[in-house]
Amino acid sequence: MSLLTEVETPTRNGWECRYSGSSDPLVIAASIIGILHLILWILDRLFFKCIYRCLKHGLKRGPSTEGVPESMREEYRQEQQNAVDVDDGHFVNIELE
């Protein structure tokens, strides 16, 4: 008998996993981690457009204005708006100092 047929032949107990009734904490922890990983993977595949769109736009909000006086905030907003207000078909070159 070849090795292949020996591997494919079911055992006396059938195709059961020998750890199915185990109460070993390591087996239980591995099972929980595996189930959580599967759930997270399924959610990621279902909602990946929404998740990554939120992350992408969340990172592009700009610098924090916490602790900056209101006059400086307004000046910054005005500069940003002026950089965006251009005719269609033209590019804006912003040089950083």
UniProtKB/Swiss-Prot annotation:
InterPro entries: Flu_M2. One of its GO terms (molecular function) is monoatomic ion channel activity. Residues 59-80 are annotated as: Disordered. It is found in: Virion membrane; Host apical cell membrane. The M2 protein from most influenza A strains is inhibited by amantadine and rimantadine, resulting in viral uncoating incapacity. Emergence of amantadine-resistant variants is usually rapid. A lipid is attached at residue 50 (S-palmitoyl cysteine). The record marks 41 as: Seems to be involved in pH gating. It comes from the Viruses. Residues 44-97 are intravirion. Its main location: virion. The record marks 37 as: Essential for channel activity, possibly by being protonated during channel activation, and by forming the channel gate and the selective filter. Gene3D superfamilies: 6.10.250.1640. Keywords: Disulfide bond, Host cell membrane, Host membrane, Host-virus interaction, Hydrogen ion transport, Inhibition of host autophagy by virus, Ion channel, Ion transport, Lipoprotein, Membrane, Palmitate, Phosphoprotein, Signal-anchor, Transmembrane, Transmembrane helix, Transport, Viral ion channel, Virion. The modification Phosphoserine is found at residue 64. The chain crosses the membrane at residues 23-43. It is a single-pass type III membrane protein. HAMAP family: INFV_M2 (MF_04069). Homotetramer; composed of two disulfide-linked dimers held together by non-covalent interactions. May interact with matrix protein 1. Belongs to the influenza viruses matrix protein M2 family. This is Matrix protein 2. The lineage of its organism: Viruses, Riboviria, Orthornavirae, Negarnaviricota, Polyploviricotina. The gene is M.
